Amino acid sequence: MTQPVVSDPPVRSRIRPEPKAGILDIVAYKPGKSLAAGFEHPIKLSSNENILGTSSKATEAFLAAADRMHLYPDSRAAKLRAAVAAHFDLEPERLVFGDGTDEVLHLLNQVFLEPGDNIVMGERGFSAYAIGARACQADVRETPEPGHRLSVPAMLGSVDERTRLVFVTQPGNPTGTFLTRAELHALHDGLPPQVVLVLDEAYAEFADDPSFDDGFALARTSQNLVITRTFSKLHGLAALRVGWAYCPQHIADAMDRIRAPFNTSICAQEAAIGALADAEFQARSLEHVRRWRPWLTQQLGGLGLEVVPSQANFVLVAFPEAPGKTAAEAEVWLAQHGLIVRGVANYGLPDCLRITVGLEEHNRALIEALADFMSR
């Protein structure tokens, strides 16, 4: 039987849709690891989650809302809006809610950036800033961070007529460092009025240095300052993705015009309201970090490791470059002992590891494993 002749497909069928210019050049976000070979329940110190878990009030509120999962949520998040406004003494109409802070940051990029514009950020800044900017075909200007700290003169010196956004992580991730009150005001005052200063304050609640400034007082009267916050860290709601921004009214209006209409679920909104109401859980979470962060810093320093002073719920640790003692080898060693930490080579810090402040038994196990590593 004669087989049919198979001809080449027409040219049209070989053409496929391609992403717009620049998309495939973007390096995707790299999350912290969650698995360690040979351990069913490893100690995860790689993602800066709340090590105490979640507020019982948040859990109860989530479960109570579960019978409404067939309904669309309130698009304006009115109850959550009122709760956040009351908790932080803010004007409710100046709040924008998102599917985690990530969405809020992307909204800012979409609102302000055109091809050829640029953003300014520190060289160790959160990679989502650059991802969002490049998706808008904007340029990214990364400024040096001497001593693991943002340089206000360097940031101001990178601003030009095409700069639309300046991103500051306050405190920084993965560094844990921060701009002092004087530095923050100098940066804000030095920016042209058409440039938006964005303070990403995912870790702000953990800061206890008297020179730390959360920026809310400044933002109340500023027309170009946006502050973002999250329920993922202190409040332990990372799985539910609830973030928000406090903006000048005209910026809030622009962001609301393009955000997804139902971007925070009923269960997430109710859990966030419950979390805000649980002052005891918040206090306990802060007390835990503020007790064990200095302990970790001291113990790691005692092993001959350099620890960057941190105002977050993690520490950044620098390892020697000597063979057998590097950060990459330490990360492998810790994983072999059931401890997952975060390598930060993708932030330009190949000699460092970022380590979340864990429970007491986690912290002691970490120090014991690293003591063995450094002495082998």
Each language-model region and where it sits:
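N-terminal "arm"/small-domain region of PLP-dependent enzymes with the aminotransferase-like
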Residues: 2-71
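PLP-dependent enzyme catalytic core of the Aspartate aminotransferase-like
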Residues: 2-5, 182, 325, 329, ...
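Phosphate-binding glycine-rich loop
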Residues: 73, 78-118
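Short acidic capping loops at alpha-helix termini that bridge into adjacent secondary structure
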Residues: 91-95, 115-118, 162, 194, ...
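PLP-dependent aminotransferase-like
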Residues: 111-168
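Active-site pre-lysine segment of PLP-dependent enzymes
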Residues: 134, 150-161, 174-197, 201-234
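PLP-dependent aminotransferase class I/II
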Residues: 224-308
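Conserved PLP-binding catalytic core of the aspartate aminotransferase-like
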Residues: 290, 301-337, 353
